[in-house]
UniProtKB/Swiss-Prot annotation:
Protein name listed in UniProt: 3-octaprenyl-4-hydroxybenzoate carboxy-lyase
Lineage, broadest ranks: Bacteria, Pseudomonadati, Pseudomonadota, Gammaproteobacteria, Alteromonadales
Binding site for prenylated FMN: I180, Y181, R182, R194, W195, L196, R199, G200
GO CC terms of this entry: cytosol; plasma membrane
Family listed: Belongs to the UbiD family.
Organism the protein comes from: Colwellia psychrerythraea (strain 34H / ATCC BAA-681)
Amino acid sequence: MKYSDLRDFISQLEKIGQLKRITQPISTHLTMTEISDRTLRAKGPALLFENAVSESGEPYNMPVLTNLFGTPDRVALAMGQKDVGALRDVGKLLAMLKEPEPPKGFRDALGKIPVYKQVLNMPVKVIKKPLCQQIVLSGDDVDLTKMPIQSCWPGDVAPLITWGLTVTRGPHKERQNLGIYRQQVLSKNKVIMRWLSHRGGALDFQEFKKENPGEKYPVSVALGADPATILGAVTPVPDTLSEYAFAGLLRGAKTEVAKSISNDLEVPATAEIILEGYLDPEEMAPEGPYGDHTGYYNEVDNFPVMTVTHITMRKDAIYHSTYTGRPPDEPAILGVALNEVFVPILQKQFPEIQDFYLPPEGCSYRLAVVTIKKQYAGHAKRVMMGVWSFLRQFMYTKFVIVCDDDINARDWEDVIWAMTTRMDPSRDTVLIENTPIDYLDFASPVSGLGSKMGMDATNKWPGETNREWGEPIEMTQEIKNQVDELWDELDIL
């Protein structure tokens, strides 16, 4: 299903009982987080707080939307799919775009016509009078303190913008980059842009500084874009494909964009709110601490400051927000859904992979379980190295467990049985030191640098062991069938 904007998606969620309107006055200071967290853990609906107030009780006159992607099925719905399993089709499309193959013949070419039709929706459509610019604020009228920006946890240093889609462009790039980076509010017109050095926005900024020393770097931030555009910003799209183009594929219609008022960056035309401004390469500020998706408060570190020169918005704008904390939180739920997108991408490069699972309790990316159809001695170690190196999304994965295809990667009882019966700790553990690690990972000895562990929990082949390998116990199919026929009659359970 196509959603023209965030409001269209909200209407659909309300029709199917997946949106709850909260009319009571609710404070954006901590209370909204607690309500959202309890709702998410109960697998409840998206929440629209229609009467958001400040800590002192002052009304904001702007509703707040939280838990939009609070269940995997809502993520699938936002991607135009009926359920999470159908997201494998999205992954297959991305795998094809990442490494396209020519048709093997006329019949194969006919089979790929639907894909080619989808590709026609990739170019953006520029709108001259966009909804996102119905209201324009500049100069002294720019005041972020009038927006219902959440303070999520007791130890958070300041209100935090969490769902902003930051739009950047490198000096030698035609395509724009969309990334979601949290932004600490410093004052009425300044926020801190917290992006890690390997992320697209940070790389664009570094290239700009080299080419234009001392100059201000233009940035725009969209809040409340349509669901396809939001998810395009968090999906592992190929580097050659823009997030706007991928959003068009998801939506089945071209992404509508508009030129920012103060710069040449294109923003989602139907977004609820746009922040426009610049980064001064000389202006940095300490960011944090904030409660993060790890379940801990992160360290304070310096990041560039964005000066907001303009705020544009729709009439009766909705502020889209979230919180991050110990899983499950909204990023963890997104991770569960996007896991299905990753599987076909990995399988295209490594056909032996049967399943791939990132447990949400592992902070969505720090531990991976892979099952393979093992073909030779040492095969598991090759797969470990492949996972760490193939997609940048797995650069920070600390632990990779590889099992045979008789193990259910998503069942801890199965995985632990394989680890305890098929692993020798010395022989089957791979340790790699001094590798890139998420700087939020305070368990690493050095910020941003730590070790990785691979665990080979597969059955061992000749060359990997000198011992006779155990044969798993299993009942014959004939006896299973006999008991199946008797089972109801026995009335045991």
